[in-house]
Curated annotation (Swiss-Prot):
Alphabetized UniProt keyword annotations: Acetylation, Apoptosis, Isomerase, Mitochondrion, Necrosis, Rotamase, S-nitrosylation, Transit peptide
GO BP terms: apoptotic mitochondrial changes; cellular response to arsenic-containing substance; cellular response to calcium ion; cellular response to hydrogen peroxide; mitochondrial depolarization; mitochondrial outer membrane permeabilization involved in programmed cell death; necroptotic process; negative regulation of apoptotic process
Protein name per UniProt: Peptidyl-prolyl cis-trans isomerase F, mitochondrial
Entry-linked Pfam families: Pro_isomerase
Feature: transit peptide: 1-29
Keyword check for Translocase: no
Organism: Homo sapiens
Catalysed reactions, semicolon-separated: [protein]-peptidylproline (omega=180) = [protein]-peptidylproline (omega=0)
CDD domains named in the record: cyclophilin_ABH_like
Subunit comment: Associates with the mitochondrial membrane ATP synthase F(1)F(0) ATP synthase; the association is increased by inorganic phosphate (Pi) and decreased by cyclosporin A (CsA). Interacts with ATP5F1B; ATP5PD and ATP5PO. Interacts with SLC25A3; the interaction is impaired by CsA. Interacts with BCL2; the interaction is impaired by CsA. Interacts with TP53; the association implicates preferentially tetrameric TP53, is induced by oxidative stress and is impaired by CsA. Interacts with C1QBP. Interacts with MCUR1.
Gene: PPIF
Length: 207
């Protein structure tokens, strides 16, 4: 089963194991630096979008810059899954796991529950690098089931999550629509179960 980790412990996608405290680390202020995916933008980096609704009601659009200048393989995977050019991708999939004051997770377009998904390179692909860090809200990072198990599942942070540095590959950040991410977050719970069905109704590439 795919999972996020908190330190050396797994945070299961469908439920939080008893060994994991329900209280997550408090939000911390972030400082701009070389590991911040939003600290500098390259004109060559792709901009993609996710249009999201909750129980059929539009929430808005999230625009993401993919850091192809730092993690080109990971960025290309996400870009192609947004456009659907490989014949599969994120359109119609859900944000299946949302934990307030932590993150919003999506990308399982096969099983829609956190147990599936696949990359454009096959089932899984290796961690590219850990240059970019989980510095604060809006960071875009890959979910995994351990080292070198990247597929299609991803998460958008709503706080600084530096305990995930070196364990999950950061590959982008929110350029526009953080208010939409906060709306998604509002439908989450400590267990990750959402109170409404949150669907990526459309997605693609802007530039």
């Amino acid at each position: 089963m795919l999972a996020l980790r908190c330190g050396s412990r797994w945070l299961g996608l469908l439920s939080v194991p008893r060994s994991v405290p329900l209280r997550l680390p408090a939000a911390r202020a972030c400082s701009k630096g070389s590991g911040d995916p939003s600290s500098s933008s390259s004109s060559g980096n792709p901009l993609v979008y996710l249009d999201v609704d909750a129980n059929g009601k539009p929430l808005g659009r999230v625009v993401l810059e993919l850091k192809a200048d730092v993690v080109p393989k990971t960025a290309e995977n996400f870009r192609a899954l947004c456009t659907g050019e490989k014949g599969f991708g994120y359109k119609g999939s859900t944000f299946h796991r949302v934990i307030p004051s932590f993150m919003c997770q999506a990308g399982d377009f096969t099983n829609h529950n956190g147990t599936g998904g696949k990359s454009i390179y096959g089932s899984r692909f290796p961690d590219e690098n850990f240059t970019l860090k989980h510095v604060g809200p809006g960071v875009l990072s890959m979910a995994n089931a351990g080292p070198n198990t990247n597929g299609s599942q991803f998460f958008i942070c709503t706080i600084k999550t530096d305990w995930l540095d070196g364990k999950h590959v950061v590959f982008g950040h929110v350029k526009e629509g953080m208010d939409v991410v906060k709306k998604i977050e509002s439908f989450g719970s400590k267990s990750g179960r959402t109170s409404k069905k949150i669907v990526i109704t459309d997605c693609g590439q802007l530039s």
